[in-house]
Amino acid sequence: MNLTTVLKTYAREHGADLVGVADLKPFKAAKFSLPEGLLDPYSHAISVAMGLDNEIINRITDHPTPEYAEHYRSINSVLDRLTSGLVHLILGYHYQAHPIPASRIMDEKNLLGSISHKAVARMAGIGWQGKSLLIINPDFGPRIRLATVLTDMPLEPDAPLKNRCGKCAECAKACPSSAIKNISTESHYSGREEALHFSNCAGKTLEFSALPGIGARICGVCVMACPFGKKSRSGSPKVR
């Protein structure tokens, strides 16, 4: 069993619904990470995803619900335990590894993490970048949460998936802040503003964070609205 298979098997056995590998060369060329130079020791990123509970997502209307907020936090915690386990496994093979938590903001003003989980997931073949900027998997739609592990372990990268949003505009129509511009792309967007009125989205999630039982800058409406999440899955993932 090669190292890529070892890591993917471990991830799936410990809760990941999806796992892929991305080459870090494009990210290093873009020279973006927080802190600067974070990626220097590493050659690959492992993207892990866990599916969100369908029934919880389906009960979202035009704002997040307290049960979605709790589910969001719970899945993030499970992902963080999984990435810690992957790091421990990689270190046992005498390679370097560093976990990027599922939901850690390094730049509060611009709402940026150490590295974009979504960008890594797209390159790792987890899904394509939708008009909402969420990663959309053919089976799960955008109903996933993501985390990342950086490593210098020699792994086999996965191929990105073809964008399948087409003319669909359900996320844009549902967006409570009219943030989604409904701009199509064959690959990915050059930046947030190409796809979103980002200040609209950021302002609305700040507003939602003050609702009773929420306490986080979340929304979930575009997650609920995407046809891929609705059409491709029967039932809900296992409760965690």
Regions from the language model: what does each represent?
Residues 30, 68-240:
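Catalytic cores of enzyme domains
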Residues 1-73:
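Non-catalytic, usually N-terminal nucleic-acid engagement modules in DNA/RNA processing proteins
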